[in-house]
Amino acid sequence: MAKKLNYSPNKLASALKSGKTHIIGVIVPSVQAHFFASIIHCIEDGLKDSGYCVIIYQSNESVENEINGVKTLLEAQVDGIMASLSLETQDVSHFAEIVKQNKPLILFDRVNADLKVPTITLDDFRAGYIATQHLIDRGYKKIAFITTIHQIKIFNDRLEGYKAALADNGLPIIEEHIIFGGLSIKDGRFGAGKLMRGRNKPDAIIAGDDFTAVGVIKKLKEIDETPPEVGVIGFANEAFSAYITPNLSTIDQHAPQIGKACAKMFLKMINQPNPYTNMEHIVLDPTVVERESTNKEAV
């Protein structure tokens, strides 16, 4: 009968009755990165059968935008929020209101230990370690590392993994081979230029993400040190990394698994009187995706 009358349920009335809007907020640094876009896609896919839709808010690496995002989403009466922190975020007190309202808050990828909430992360120490070990196994010995100046746990852990791999292989940690700056194509070009102008030039460079790695490759091409002559590896396995020249070796951070785990965790939390009962902290293992930029045998 309802179908014949072209009836559709009033979602506002349903929300008022149930206390739930079936809307989820997701805050990410940027949807331009395939990594975050893939996570969002899998969150949406994992929630649609339960009747949830997603509002996306980009922080663009700004803590001010992130604060506004939390406020905006709470005003929209979302049932919960999932977030990956901006590079600028140190104080996470703006997320406390979500917990105070007894709404699910899940942090993924970039997290902060001050927030006692469920998390889904990569083993970033291992990510830094296996990126370095991969280069060592391919014959590179003087390995540099370009990372962010911001004190974000995932990037700190990767740097520590890099240092541990060097030490385990009896290779020195050379401070001038560690560049702190931004994470972008421009920053990759700048960092590679600085490294290759130094007295102790590296024979391989680990870039903080795949965008930075593109900048590194561009600079190396300009000075006729095209990879894999100088090895380059990034992080995130962005969609473009398989199609640039030379194509880019990278660390796969398993974005689809992160998104699926976020959706599954949310559905578990939303059906509990206290969503923070039996909190989970899921840690995924990274893997190396080897391509031309570290494959000396292809030369």
What do the PLM-derived regions correspond to, one by one?
Residues 1-22, 295-298:
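N-terminal helix-turn-helix DNA-binding module of bacterial transcription factors
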Residues 2, 47, 165-166, 196, ...:
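Conserved hydrophobic residues forming the short capping helix/wall of the S-adenosyl-L-methionine
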Residues 18-133, 137, 195-197, 201, ...:
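Alpha-helical recognition/docking segments in bacterial nutrient-uptake
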Residues 29-38, 56-65, 85-87, 110, ...:
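Hinge/beta->alpha junction and helix N-cap segments in small-molecule ligand-binding domains
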Residues 49-50, 101, 166-173, 198-201, ...:
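Short helix-capping segments at alpha-helix termini
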Residues 142, 173-177, 226-232:
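Short acidic capping loops at alpha-helix termini that bridge into adjacent secondary structure
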Residues 193-299:
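Flexible loop/turn connectors
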